[in-house]
């Protein structure tokens, strides 16, 4: 919840870096985009993106919004030039001719599974149909059910992966297919809860939400369900449920932005339009298969084999076999505003780190204090949209499950020295090639499958 976070303290600008206003048109456009996405009113052309609240996922939003203003650059350009002044020098105001053109029409046909989708089917879940992500929105104004239905019809037509199906062949292999059209009537439900009391409203919504979650079917479809809860004079609720095979955290941001724009246009009586498509999930899948056989990815193999050889497990009291869903418990911890400010702003400035560096240092120290062994092996997740591995690929407005999962081995030789520990963890994480996306490609897409299928506890 970004609204509950402290506003970035722009007094943390580096010494000697005063506020410098944008002067050129491209600088002004970029400042406006950064202000909107980061929710900061005043941004100068020398403010560092990552020190005022930016991160790798937000950078994808920046790229997408800039494209709508006909300003073109890649996520890697933000990392290489993290100020508006620097970025304006590498950005282009017209799109280069791409070797691989984004498909603007309906996409259909088989799609190679991405590494994270291979991982999903490898789990052999008892109920693979119920592995969903969802969001429940409370409307500020009454929602027009007819316009809402039209909006989602358009979104499902535009974002192709929402029309996917999966089937398992006799060999055990799962096949992913993009349908050219969807039975839109099966996506949409309206519940009239106007007569339900305030006391019972939440339980009624929860019950229907559970049924909607259980109704998804990756083989028969659909992968998406939308429900409008009409609550009389009380604010309506909108529930969107999508199977994880078709969506990730970045995808939700794209979907919300498109839904808001389309619904508002329909409400105003205008013909809705969506931004041009970026490369399809299908194009990404085929490109990853080709990349998996390349010399570049095979050069990463010694690194990942060394990581696998270094992995160690946490000590356990009992050997109960594989962990199941019923073994999972959640522990919630909250930080004060002062602690949050230190974590997000003060410490990163002092050590030139990102939040992952600090959190993983703290975790390694905590586990080490418990086990008296200051080494830790764990899996990390990334957004997986490392499009720089594929020339001319743009995924900034593509919906799908792109997440990367990869093992990391952390080791502290001098845990008493906090500064040295932070530096050690930081350097270990910086050595990971292409932010870890190569591990899954080698493990699942390479023809000779050179990496093991061992998992961490």
Question: What name fits each language-model region?
Answer:
Residues 1, 10-125, 146, 150, ...:
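Regions immediately C-terminal to embedded phosphopantetheine-bearing carrier domains
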Residues 1-6, 161-163, 303:
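Structured, non-catalytic alpha/beta "coupling" segments that mediate domain-domain communication
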Residues 27, 72, 140-163, 240-257, ...:
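Acyl activation and transfer enzymes in specialized metabolism, enriched
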Residues 33, 37, 61, 86, ...:
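Amphipathic alpha-helical segments in well-ordered regions
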Residues 35, 39, 117, 121-132, ...:
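Flexible, P/S/T/G-rich "lid" or insertion loops adjacent to the active sites of thioester-utilizing
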Residues 65-67, 105-181, 187-189, 196-291, ...:
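Acyl-group handoff/entry surfaces in thioester-processing enzymes
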Residues 106-109, 124-132, 160-164, 184, ...:
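His-Asp-centered acyl/peptidyl-transfer active-site segments
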């Amino acid at each position: 919840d970004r609204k509950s976070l402290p506003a970035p303290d722009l007094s943390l600008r580096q010494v000697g870096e005063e506020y410098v206003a944008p002067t050129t048109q491209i600088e002004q456009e970029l400042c406006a985009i950064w202000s909107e996405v980061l929710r900061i009113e005043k941004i100068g052309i020398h403010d560092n993106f990552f020190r005022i609240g930016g991160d790798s996922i937000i950078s994808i939003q920046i790229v997408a919004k800039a494209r709508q203003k006909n300003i073109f650059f890649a996520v890697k350009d933000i990392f290489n030039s993290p100020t508006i002044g620097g970025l304006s020098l590498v950005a282009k105001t017209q799109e280069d001719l791409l070797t691989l053109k984004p498909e603007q029409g309906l996409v259909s046909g088989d799609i190679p599974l991405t590494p994270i989708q291979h991982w999903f089917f490898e789990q052999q879940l008892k109920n693979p149909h119920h592995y969903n992500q969802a969001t429940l929105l409370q409307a500020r104004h009454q929602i027009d059910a007819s316009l809402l239905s039209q909006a989602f019809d358009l979104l499902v037509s535009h974002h192709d992966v929402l029309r996917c199906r999966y089937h398992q062949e006799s060999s055990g292999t799962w096949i992913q297919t993009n349908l050219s059209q969807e039975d839109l009537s099966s996506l949409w439900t309206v519940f009239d809860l106007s007569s339900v009391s305030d006391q019972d409203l939440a339980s009624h919504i929860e019950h229907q939400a559970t049924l909607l979650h259980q109704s998804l079917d990756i083989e028969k479809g659909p992968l998406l369900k939308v429900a409008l809860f009409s609550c009389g004079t009380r604010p309506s609720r909108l529930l969107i449920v999508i199977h994880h095979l078709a969506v990730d955290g970045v995808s939700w941001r794209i979907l919300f932005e498109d839904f808001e724009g389309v619904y508002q246009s329909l409400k105003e009586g205008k013909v809705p339009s969506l931004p041009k498509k970026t490369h399809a999930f299908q194009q990404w899948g085929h490109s990853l298969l080709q990349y998996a056989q390349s010399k570049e990815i095979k050069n990463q193999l010694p690194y990942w084999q060394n990581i696998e050889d270094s992995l160690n497990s946490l000590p356990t009291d009992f050997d109960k076999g594989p962990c199941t869903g019923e073994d999972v418990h959640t522990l919630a911890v909250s930080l004060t505003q002062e602690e949050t400010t230190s974590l997000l702003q003060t410490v990163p400035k002092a050590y030139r780190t990102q939040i992952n560096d600090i959190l993983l240092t703290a975790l390694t120290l905590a586990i080490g204090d418990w086990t008296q062994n200051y080494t830790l092996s764990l899996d990390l997740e990334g957004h997986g949209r490392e499009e720089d591995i594929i020339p001319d690929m743009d995924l900034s407005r593509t919906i799908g499950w792109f997440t990367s999962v990869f093992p990391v081995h952390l080791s502290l030789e001098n845990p008493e020295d906090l500064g040295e520990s932070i530096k050690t963890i930081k350097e270990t994480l910086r050595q990971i090639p292409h932010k870890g996306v190569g591990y899954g490609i080698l493990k699942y897409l390479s023809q000779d499958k050179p990496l093991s299928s061992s998992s961490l506890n």
